[in-house]
Structures are given as structure tokens and as C-alpha cells.
Amino acid sequence: MLFMLRWTTAGESHGQALISMIENLPAGLSVSREDVSYQLARRRLGYGRGARMKFEADEVTFVGGVRHGKTLGSPVAVMIGNTEWPKWTTIMSADPIDESDPEVAKEMASGRGAKLTRPRPGHADFSGMVKYDHDEARPILERSSARETAARVAAGTFARALLREVLGVEVLSHVISIGRSEPYEGPSPEFSDLEGIDASPVRAFDSAVEESMIDEIKAAKKSGDTLGGIVEVVVKGLPIGLGSHVSGDERLDAQLAAALMGIQAIKGVEIGDGFEEARRRGSEAHDEMEAAANGGVHRLSNRAGGLEGGMTNGEELRVRAAMKPISTVPRALKTVDMATGEAATGIHQRSDVCAVPAAGVVAETMVALVLARAVLKKFGGDSVEETKRNVQSYLEYVDTRLDWSAEANDVADGEVADGEIR
């Protein structure tokens, strides 16, 4: 575990900057600030986003680990500056403040600086205030905010580059449903469809369900409410054998589920047909196999979503995540004032009506990071070229292993071919 791909983030929602750290990437990956900015812009997409998306910009700086557009093999650090920081320098100051100063006292007593003692139901406010012994929610909500996912998206840009350069695969997502909208039930999109998906106001693959999603958001906004939904992440072209069956924490499905559940507001994850599988009989639940004429295996279905026994099986990886409605509800919910114990309504700051389209981009990020870690664990490599050589050697082995011709099987079994033991 010590030398596996690792990532972490630091920073608060209204702090000076967010920081993303990625360790144990191979040298030679091609990643630019423009690549990171592009993914961050995708994270801001979607009908139903709040005003904050309009005036906040993501200022990307590579602090370390990259030179001339290539990773060095050392830890990578990315900083995403907060363009609104001048408005928050006192309230979010890392240094002690002098509240005897009239100007400081005024700023801390009203507006942005006022103590937030009314925790929002569904948010981290209440449990965090009790656990960390804070007298207000500001120290909790600043870190628990989904703004933190911007730093994850930055890290995920490097994971995407690894998957692209080493395996030639891409990660994409689309929105299945929002609220009670008609769900999408068609085939999975191809990566070539991504531009069209991102052009959709709700990141829908099918225009037929797009209108239903938009109507849901309009209705929620009109009634002062918020909405959740379901996103699907799709990855095609993964090799057989990423992950492992040998222990629970090495199962790729467990890692994917944990990574997706770690996204703010995600309350459920399913792989493949997921919960629908529980309603089927065994004879209808599993993906039967046939030997393909040109070698390899052909599946008659992909209900497993590309994972069996904690490992990729060569089929399309398909993972869904369910996002609950945003906790900051304009029509404020009942709560208790933690300063007095009196009945109150939850604090309300600017928020989105629906962030499901953006959640899809964050879900892509987490899937990419988990897959990149699995790739490096299986194939290793201090440089991209070394990792590619290792991948190529393995793929050649798989092709030979699944070549059903009699001669190939004889060679694989160590029998004589052309007068030699191979």
C-alpha cells in the first residue's frame, strides 16, 4: 500500500485556495493547466446551478511535480485559487484576529462573519459541531462543502491522463434521472458522445428525457426546493484482471463504491444492474459466455457491469451513483439553535437547486482515480513508457491465453510446436 497511487485535498470552501496532492504517478504523463481547467469547467455545468457558479473562477497553478507539461515522478501539487478571497480574508483568516479592533468586530458580527448556530438538516453541521466542539457551523461547512470536489477533479485529471496514455481508455458520465423525471433506459454512450452530453443543460445522453429533467428542476425552483438524481459512469476498453478477489479491500467494486460514496450527497451506488439483480433468479442474473471465433470470450449480456469477483472481466464498466437533494433548502427546514436550544429554521446561504450534472463529472473523477491506482498496482512502472511496456506484455499474454486454436493451446500447455518447447 505504501507505494500505491495516493491523493488528498486541503482547503476550505471560502479559503484562499484549494490544494490537490497526488503521489506515486509515473514520470512522463502529459498534463497541462488547460487540461485541469477544462475538467473544472465541466464540473460547473448544469441547469439548476446557483449564482456562485457565475462569478467564481478556478485559477489553476501547478506548484510541483510537473515540468514543461510532463509529470516528473515526484508528488504533484495543484492549487486552485479562490477569486472571492478578498471578501473573506478576515472571516477565514488563518492568523489570529483582533476582535477589539472595531472594523474586525463589525465584520465578524454581521453578514458573512455572523455565527452560524442553526445546523441544516442533512448537512455535516450538527454532527461536526458536536464532534469537534465548535460553537458554530462555519468550521464544519467550509470543509464539508462540495466545493472541495474541485480539488479532486484536479487530481482526477492526472488519473485520466494515465488511463488514456497507458490503456487508451476514457471515462465518461451522463445523467440517468433527476428527481422523478423519466429515467434513461437506453444503451450506454460512447466517448465520442461526450461533447453532446456536456452540451445538454442537464448532461443527458437522450434528448427525449432531457426535457423531463428540466421540468423537474423548474418546478423545484419555483417551490423553493432542491433535487437529487442518478448519474452513470461508463468506461470501455479496460483489460481483464484489474482488482483482485483475495481480500475485501482489494476488490475493485468495493473501492469504486467507497470512492463514489465519499462524494458529498451521494447516498447509494450500484455496479451493473445492481439492485435489480436481487429481483432475478440466478439463471437470469449472470452473463453467459461463448468462445469468440477470433479468440477471446463473448458475453451474451453485461448485467455485472464489467466486474466479477472484484476484478474487471473485459466488459464495459458501468457504475451508477444516487445523489440526494441538496441539503441547503431555500424553504428552510426545522432545526434547533445550538446556542439556545430554541426551535429555529436551518441557515440558508446561496446554493444550487440541482447539482446532479456536476456530480456526474465528480463521479468520473473518482472512478478514474480508483482505476488509475488499480492499473499502477497491477502493472507498476516509474515512467509512462515502462508502464506501457508492462501493459503490452500482459495483453499479449491474455491474447495467447484466450486463443482457442489447437496449436495455440498446445503451446500454452508447454507441448511441442515446431520441434521446440516454448
Swiss-Prot record:
Q: Which UniProt keywords apply?
A: Amino-acid biosynthesis, Aromatic amino acid biosynthesis, FAD, Flavoprotein, FMN, Lyase, NADP
Name the SUPFAM superfamilies for this protein: Chorismate synthase, AroC (SSF103263)
Which sites bind FMN?
R143, S144, S145, Q264, A265, G309, K324, P325, I326, S327, T328, R350
One GO molecular function term? FMN binding
- Read off the InterPro entries from this record: Chorismate_synth, Chorismate_synth_AroC_sf, Chorismate_synthase_CS
Enzyme Commission number, as recorded? 4.2.3.5
As cofactor, the record names:
FMNH2
Gene3D superfamilies found in the cross-reference section: Chorismate synthase AroC (3.60.150.10)
Q: Which residues form a coiled coil?
A: none
Q: Where does the source fall among the domains of life?
A: Bacteria
**Per its UniProt record, what PROSITE patterns does this chain match?**
CHORISMATE_SYNTHASE_2, CHORISMATE_SYNTHASE_3
The record's catalysed reaction(s) read:
5-O-(1-carboxyvinyl)-3-phosphoshikimate = chorismate + phosphate
- Family to which the UniProt record says this protein belongs: Belongs to the chorismate synthase family.
Assembly with partners or alone = Homotetramer.
UniProt-listed NCBIfam families: aroC, PRK05382.1
Record's function text: This reaction introduces a second double bond into the aromatic ring system.
For this entry, the protein name equals Chorismate synthase
Q: Which organism is it from?
A: Corynebacterium jeikeium (strain K411)
Output the lineage of the source organism.
Bacteria, Bacillati, Actinomycetota, Actinomycetes, Mycobacteriales
